Design a protein with these regions (language model features):
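Acidic/aromatic-lined carbohydrate-recognition and catalytic surfaces
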Residues: 3-181, 185
Length: 187
């Protein structure tokens, strides 16, 4: 574990709009690496990455499709390792934004959950509709419409407090909590 002092200054980076380091017209981790000295000169003690995991992009990367990888458009794991090593050489910390309220609907866990493949069956919050085809409850999504969407494959509604493409994980399920622990240990 790492206890960070409360007085540290972090520079939050969304690489896509930060700096293009590989010449493809989009910011990436290679560009972040090139600017580490500049960030250090600003007086920052570390960098905080907005989500840089593989994502379909329905919500700026917050719809994560794989927690244990870096999106190829940002340079993949090789670029991340370069940034991490470069930051540590400059005595800087690196924080990853980790969203575990929900995943992308393209995440392997969700795809298996909607098909009722164990142990993933209850990795998400699923409910049957009420009589007369009504939603499980009247909750609204923070993004769009209601917090429930019917899934034709499973024949039930899944909850999404954010975007439709961001099904909520069932944190009451101990297997889900173990998966989150695996992700934390990985990073």
């Amino acid at each position: 574990t790492c206890a960070l002092p409360i007085y540290m200054v972090f520079y939050q980076i969304w690489p896509r709009s930060f700096k293009d380091g590989d010449g493809d017209g989009m910011g990436d981790l290679w560009g972040v690496y090139e600017k580490l000295d500049y960030i250090k000169e600003l007086g920052c003690d570390g960098i905080w990455f907005s989500p840089i995991y593989p994502s379909p992009g329905a919500d700026g990367g917050y719809d994560i499709a794989n927690y244990m990888d870096i999106a190829p458009e940002f340079g993949g794991m090789a670029a991340f390792r370069r940034v991490l090593d470069g930051a540590h050489e400059r005595d800087m910390k690196v924080i990853m934004d980790l969203v575990v309220n929900h995943t992308s609907d393209e995440h392997e866990w969700f795809q298996k959950s909607r098909q009722r493949i164990d142990p993933y069956t209850d990795y998400y919050i699923w409910r049957p509709g009420k009589p007369n085809g009504k939603l499980p409850n009247n909750w609204d999504s923070l993004f769009e419409g209601k917090a429930w969407t019917y899934d034709e494959v499973r024949g039930e509604y899944y909850m999404h407090l954010f975007a439709i493409k961001q099904p909520d994980l069932n944190m009451d399920n101990p297997l889900v909590r173990e998966e989150v622990k695996k992700v934390l240990k990985f990073w």
